[in-house]
Amino acid sequence: MSKRVFMFPGQGSQYIGMGKEFYEAFPAAKEVFELAGEAAKLDVAKLCFEEEDKIDQTEYTQIAMLTTEAAILKVLQMEGVTADAAAGLSLGEYAAILAAEVMEPSDVFSLIRKRGQYMQNAVPTGGAMAAVLGMDAAVIEKVCEETIGEVFVANYNCPGQIVITGEQSAVDRASESLKEAGAKRVVPLKVSGPFHSPLLQEAGQKLSTALEKVQISTPKIGYLSNVTADYVTDPEKIRSLLPVQVCHSVCWQQTIERLIADGCDEFVEIGPGKTLSGFLRKINREIKCSNIDKLEDLKKYVG
């Protein structure tokens, strides 16, 4: 029997106008934007559709992306499309939390707004990230360990694409060493800080405090953590892992491999862009994959 996964992208795929077609076509999607706006104390619709100067700033990107993903998810659910499991990359994990009904939507929107602010404010000056293409993970890990300064693996995206993070000078040194060691390319990323590194510990601590007040339930469908790349069912374990996720590597490739090993054979990427679909094809070309970003994608998918 077929097993479907909903997967949700993280920062980087955002664009002005994302979610607008759903907002205009479905009252339920509009309600999601309004609920997110109330929880985040922000006009999220205006942010997503008009505010080009803000959409790429972490403190705004996170609530904008999550709201768009949540609105599309809501419409899919109304169309009767269900999933056996949910996973999301970085901030996308909070959309997976919504899909698995782990927390109340208003709590999730409020949390992601805080997470964006905490991460933006915790950013040390001179942090950087870079994507390393065409190199084995073990070599990258070794170079990071041997480089002088603070540099770490941020994301295990898929075979041949790993992201490093840390102090600008250390990331630059590691990038040069990786090129010398045979990396196909090392591409600096346009981000505002060294995300998913121990340098963001302060943001993790603040998020931990914010999570203390939140009611967390047992997931209704399979829910996987970026930190462990495995299913998590215990509410208290979820509470403790989410703050860790901010300053820990995102084990995305391992998460997808875990789901495939569990018999999941259809993946639906919900939200802006096709980043995760691209990763999936590099992990396993045989797996059926769709992505729903625009209204025409939805029509094509639900027939």
PLM feature segments, named:
Residues 64-69, 245-252:
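A short, flexible low-complexity segment enriched in Lys/Arg and Gly/Pro that occurs
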Residues 247-264:
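A short, acidic, amphipathic alpha-helical segment used as a generic capping/interface helix at domain edges
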Residues 11-13, 38-40, 100-248:
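Alpha/beta catalytic cores of group-transfer enzymes, especially the acyltransferase/condensing modules
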Residues 77, 179, 260-263:
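Non-catalytic positions within long, well-ordered alpha-helices that form the structural scaffold/packing
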Residues 2-139, 185, 189, 266-296:
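FabD-like malonyl-/acyl-CoA
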Residues 297-303:
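Short, charged, surface-exposed secondary-structure boundary motifs
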Residues 143, 255-258, 301:
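CheY-like receiver
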